[in-house]
Amino acid sequence: MNYKNLLAGLAAGLLLYAQAGWHVALAAVPPDAPKDVKHILGFYYGNGENILIRENGGRLELLYRFSMQDKAFGSSNIYPLAKEHFDSYTLNEAGPMTSSESTVRFERDPDGYGISCRVGGHVYSRAFVGTTTGERGKELRFPTHSAEEWEQLRAQAVAAPMPDELAAGQQVELVDASTVAGLKIDSRYGQADNCFGAPLYTSEKLFVGKEAAAALGKVQQHLAAYGYGLVLWDAYRPWSVSKLANLALPAESKDMLEDPETKGSAHNTGNAVDVSLYDLATGEQLEMISGFDEPSFRQFASYAGGTSRQRYLRDLLREAMELYGFKGIEMEWWHFDFRPGTNWAHLNVNM
């Protein structure tokens, strides 16, 4: 048997299969949900219960969760809603012995936002979160500091010594992230438009470990076939900046970040990144399932709500990143660690 020809044939077959699958994936990108639909999607509460309204395949679905611990609504019962007319739907609950039918009606405010949902005789009120289309929640903003206070905090952070134990491990060579072809830089902590209301970095440049940068380049090439590119929101963070963030947080919020004195941040290693997607044709960032640093259930990587398109984009991003050595975390869909099993050294080099 000619194994060389056999292997060549198998390789060609796999290539054709991959290309076919690739085009299926390209064709399967869900269309965006209409704006009036987005305005009623989200979280509703009442009667000691919580429900979630999402769009799936062009239809609305009601998700009912049994446990408050199911923050992502991943174990919810899912009920398709059959549209009767504008904002009025029918929910059919069918079982092996019985079945029931309920009317589901949404009430909107004058601006078109859903504010309540009536399911049969029960009324659920809308809880707004985030600022993406259809939501009108508030962005996360910590109490602000004056310019003078920021300078004092920065000086205190720079003067603080990084614990020796954090410096142990494999050090990376940092490179300018802008050298990765096609990567869009949008340094959220290099600008004032973030949860601190002030830039934490002294520059909007972002740096990342050399190997991680090469992997980002491969992710960028992978996503280009879909018409998308990577947006880099954050990457290497000097330990002193993690210390600055900790000092700037109010006492009741300090547990929102890793303690810089004991654990530090994965971003200190140069191998953690916060990323999203942009449209290669327009250069515009895509609307994802939640905003950056949004402190809500929508930030979870397995969150079951939103629209089909939003979930598709989030999952596509995760799939592409994990294909090239990154690993996502459940808490934040935008955060990825490069080769997390490696003992990376924390760095305190100001770039």
Regions found by a protein language model. Give the residues of each.
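Bacterial N-terminal signal peptides that target proteins for export
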Residues: 2-10
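Peripheral terminal and inter-domain segments
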Residues: 19-148
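Bacterial N-terminal signal peptides
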Residues: 9-20
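Low-complexity, intrinsically disordered Gly/Pro/Thr-rich segments
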Residues: 103-106, 110-113, 322-336
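Beta-rich nucleic-acid/ligand-interaction surfaces
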Residues: 239-245, 336-343
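Extracytoplasmic cell-surface/polysaccharide-interacting catalytic and binding patches
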Residues: 134-233, 248-331, 339-351
